[in-house]
């Protein structure tokens, strides 16, 4: 819930700033969030579709197909080499329980909720001094 008369429209992240954020998060050993930002910016998926992804779908493949939750449409996504390397590096660092595991799992072992991701993004905005206003999950989709 937002404050009355407040602007809640998500803003996009500048591409260079987004890529710097991906690198900074990786360097700071926040591999899951680095992967989330990279996937969100490169593929333009809705957060509900990103949270539903599993490692077996995206690891060591050139493309994959999903059914979008909101629209029910089938979408084929190609993975460029730069992102493919980043996914493999994050997989090695995160060390998930298996290839069938979801890619975005919290410390509790459950898939993140959208609200939790939004809170983490707002903390990231402050920590990394991002120039984007109203930074949220949808900002990643708009950056695409």
PLM region spans:
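Charged, surface-exposed interaction regions in soluble eukaryotic proteins
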Residues: 91-94, 134
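Alpha-helix N-cap/helix-start motif at helix boundaries, enriched for small hydrophobics
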Residues: 36, 48-53
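C-terminal catalytic core of Y-nucleophile DNA break-rejoin enzymes
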Residues: 7, 69-89, 100-122
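Short, basic (Lys/Arg/His-rich) helix/loop patches that form interaction surfaces
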Residues: 25-33, 119-143
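Basic, Lys/Arg- and aromatic-enriched nucleic-acid-binding interface segment
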Residues: 2, 12-43
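Conserved tyrosine-mediated DNA breakage-rejoining catalytic core shared by Y-recombinases
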Residues: 17, 52-85
């Amino acid at each position: 819930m937002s404050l009355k008369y407040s602007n809640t429209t998500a803003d996009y992240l500048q591409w260079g700033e987004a890529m710097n954020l991906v690198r900074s998060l990786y360097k700071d050993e926040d591999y899951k969030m680095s992967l989330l930002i990279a996937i969100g910016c490169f593929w333009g998926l809705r957060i509900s579709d990103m949270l539903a992804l599993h490692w077996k779908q995206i690891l060591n493949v050139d493309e994959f197909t999903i059914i979008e939750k909101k629209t029910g449409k089938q979408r084929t996504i190609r993975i460029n080499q730069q992102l493919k390397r980043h996914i493999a590096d994050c997989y090695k660092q995160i060390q998930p329980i298996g290839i069938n595991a979801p890619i975005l799992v919290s410390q509790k072992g459950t898939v993140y909720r959208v609200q939790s991701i939004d809170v983490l993004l707002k903390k990231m905005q402050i920590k990394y001094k991002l120039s984007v206003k109203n930074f949220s999950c949808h900002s990643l989709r708009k950056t695409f």
